[in-house]
Design a protein with these regions (language model features):
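Alpha-helical scaffold segments
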Residues: 1-275
Length: 275
C-alpha cells in the first residue's frame, strides 16, 4: 500500500505546475524519488536556488544544481569547502571561466577539485606549470592536455610517476625518442607503451634484440613484418613463445612446414600448422 502511495505521489508531481508546491514537495515529501521528480519539474531559478540551499540531501542538491545557471552562485558553491566534493565538482563543470578555474587549480585544498579545474583549462603555459605540480594526480591531468613535444619528452624523462610518463608518451610522436624510452625505461609498462607507438621496423628490431623485458620484446616482435628477420627468430630464438610470435607472422608455407616438423616444442608445431 505504501509503495502505491509513493507511486501515486510521483505521478501527482508530474501534473503539478505550481513552482512553490514543487519546492515544498522537493524539500519535505516522504518519498525520495518523488522529491527528485519535483526538482526536475522546477524551472524557476529562484526556486532551484532555495531548494539547493535548504536541502541537506546531497543527491537532491545535485539535481537542483544541474539546472542552476547563475555563474555567481556556481562559483560560490565551487569555492565552499563545506559542500561535498561531488557538488563542488558539478559546480565547476557548469562554470565557464578560465581564470576562475586557474584559481581553483592553484589554491584549492581538495585534490579532486583541483584536478577537475585543471581538466577544463586550455592555457598551455598554465598547464605546463601544473604538469610540474607536487601532487601526482594534478600532474597527470595536466600532462594529458599538453601538446608541446619537447616538454612532453622532458616530462617522460624526468617524472618519477609511471602513469604520468605513460600519458606523456601517448602524445609523443618522435620515433627515435620513443625507442630510447622503450630501451631505457625502468618500468616495464612504460617501455611497453613506448613500443606500442613505434612503427619503424628498424627500431622495432633493435628493441626486440636489446630490451631486457620479455613483454617489450614480445610486443616489438608482434609488430615486425620483415620476413627474413622473423624466420631467423623462428629458427634461432631459445624462447618458444617468441618463436610462436614470429611464426604467426610468417607467410612462407614451405618454411612453416619445416618448423612444424623440426621445432622441438609442441606449441610451436601447432602455431606453424594452424597459425
Amino acid at each position: 500500500m505504501q509503495n502505491y502511495e509513493f507511486k501515486s505521489r510521483k505521478e501527482y508531481v508530474k501534473r503539478v505546475t505550481s513552482q512553490e508546491e514543487l519546492k515544498e514537495i522537493a524539500l519535505h515529501d516522504k518519498d525520495p524519488e518523488t522529491r527528485l521528480e519535483a526538482v526536475r519539474r522546477i524551472t524557476m531559478q529562484k526556486i532551484l536556488r532555495e531548494v539547493f540551499l535548504n536541502s541537506s540531501w546531497c543527491k537532491l542538491k545535485l539535481e537542483a544544481l544541474k539546472k542552476i545557471k547563475s555563474q555567481k552562485l556556481l562559483k560560490k558553491i565551487a569555492l565552499d569547502n563545506n559542500y561535498d566534493i561531488e557538488i563542488r565538482i558539478e559546480a565547476i563543470r557548469k562554470i565557464d571561466d578560465q581564470e576562475f578555474w586557474k584559481i581553483i587549480a592553484l589554491h584549492d585544498t581538495e585534490e579532486n577539485v583541483r584536478c577537475e579545474a585543471v581538466s577544463r583549462i586550455t592555457d598551455q603555459d598554465f598547464l605546463k606549470q601544473r604538469a610540474l605540480d607536487d601532487v601526482p594526480s594534478v600532474r597527470y591531468v595536466a600532462i594529458k592536455k599538453i601538446g608541446d613535444q619537447e616538454f612532453l619528452k622532458q616530462r617522460a624523462l624526468d617524472d618519477d610517476d609511471p602513469d604520468i610518463i605513460y600519458e606523456a608518451i601517448k602524445n609523443i610522436y618522435d620515433q627515435e625518442f620513443l625507442m630510447e624510452i622503450a630501451l631505457n625505461a625502468k618500468d616495464e609498462d612504460v617501455a611497453w607503451s613506448a613500443v606500442d607507438k613505434i612503427k619503424l621496423q628498424r627500431l622495432l628490431k633493435k628493441i626486440f634484440l636489446e630490451s631486457p623485458f620479455f613483454r617489450v620484446k614480445y610486443k616489438a616482435l608482434s609488430k615486425i613484418t620483415n620476413q627474413a628477420f622473423l624466420k631467423q627468430v623462428a629458427v634461432n630464438n631459445p624462447n618458444w613463445e617468441l618463436r610462436c610470435v614470429a611464426i604467426s607472422s610468417i607467410k612462407d608455407q614451405e618454411f612453416l612446414k619445416q618448423r612444424a616438423l623440426n621445432d622441438t616444442y609442441p606449441n610451436v608445431h601447432l602455431t606453424a600448422i594452424w597459425g
